[in-house]
């Protein structure tokens, strides 16, 4: 179990000296666990995840002729209206999970900041390199990165879903395909008719698979006082 912050680190991410923090493996492990815990809470709080048994039963009863279409539609409607919000909650877990994996393995999750806009300079090269592959925390010292050269913003989900990052993160292929699709969908314009078209038995199966994956991560859950 990861331990809570020590050595005077602030709990507010904006106040943390990240150059120092990245050299403290115990603290990185704590942060990774905290990301897992926060993301898991959001995922489990998604309306559609909480309602998976109800939705599964509704589709089954409709197929078996136990309930008519209007009744099934009425049961599914609340999940359609909340689907975009639930997509965000689902993606938040996987974004946090992937950042936590990178931290746990000793890689930088923050973007680099170059005030010179010189792509050939030291930081410019790190920015370019980060778009192609994860940057190990050791590079911060090797490249003499200063606090002001590390952005408060972290890398985005699209980058972490790339093959070069997945070589380290290693989401299972079936999980990865579903997460990519949900992430792409949440970045589109949304209408209720589109959400209704997405919500079906195939999506329910996919969400059950994601839910099972999330449950497997409970061993990495951390609490602030642990």
Question: Where are these predicted regions, by residue range?
Answer:
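Charged alpha-helical initiation segments
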Residues: 1-85
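Charge-rich, solvent-exposed alpha-helical interaction surfaces
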Residues: 18, 51-61, 122, 126-129, ...
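Generic structural signal for well-ordered, non-transmembrane alpha-helical segments
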Residues: 20, 24-27, 84, 88-92, ...
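Short, contiguous, well-structured surface segments enriched in hydrophobic/aromatic residues
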Residues: 25, 29-61, 96-103, 124-150
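Short, charge-rich amphipathic alpha-helical segments embedded
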Residues: 60-68, 103-107, 218-220
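Short, hydrophobic, well-ordered secondary-structure elements
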Residues: 78-106
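Short, charged amphipathic alpha-helical segments flanked by flexible coils
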Residues: 102-171, 201
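Charge-enriched, short contiguous segments at helix-coil
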Residues: 109, 163-226
């Amino acid at each position: 179990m990861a331990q809570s912050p020590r050595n005077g680190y602030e709990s507010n991410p904006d106040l943390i000296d990240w150059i120092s923090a990245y050299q403290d493996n115990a603290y990185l492990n704590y942060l990774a666990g905290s990301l897992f815990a926060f993301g898991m809470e959001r995922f489990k709080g998604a309306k559609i995840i909480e309602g998976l048994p109800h939705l599964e039963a509704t589709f089954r009863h409709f197929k078996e002729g136990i309930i008519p279409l209007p009744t099934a539609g009425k049961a599914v409607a609340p999940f359609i209206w909340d689907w975009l919000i639930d997509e965000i909650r689902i993606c938040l877990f996987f974004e946090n999970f992937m950042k936590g994996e990178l931290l746990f393995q000793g890689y930088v999750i923050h973007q680099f900041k170059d005030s010179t806009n010189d792509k050939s300079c030291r930081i410019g090269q790190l920015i370019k390199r980060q778009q192609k592959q994860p940057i190990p925390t050791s590079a911060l010292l090797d490249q003499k990165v200063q606090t002001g050269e590390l952005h408060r913003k972290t890398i985005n989900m699209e980058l972490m879903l790339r093959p070069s990052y997945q070589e380290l993160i290693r989401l299972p292929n079936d999980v990865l395909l579903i997460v990519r699709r949900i992430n792409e969908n949440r970045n589109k314009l949304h209408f209720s008719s589109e959400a209704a078209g997405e919500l079906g038995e195939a999506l329910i199966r996919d969400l059950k698979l994601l839910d099972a994956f999330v449950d497997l991560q409970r061993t990495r859950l951390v609490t602030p006082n642990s």
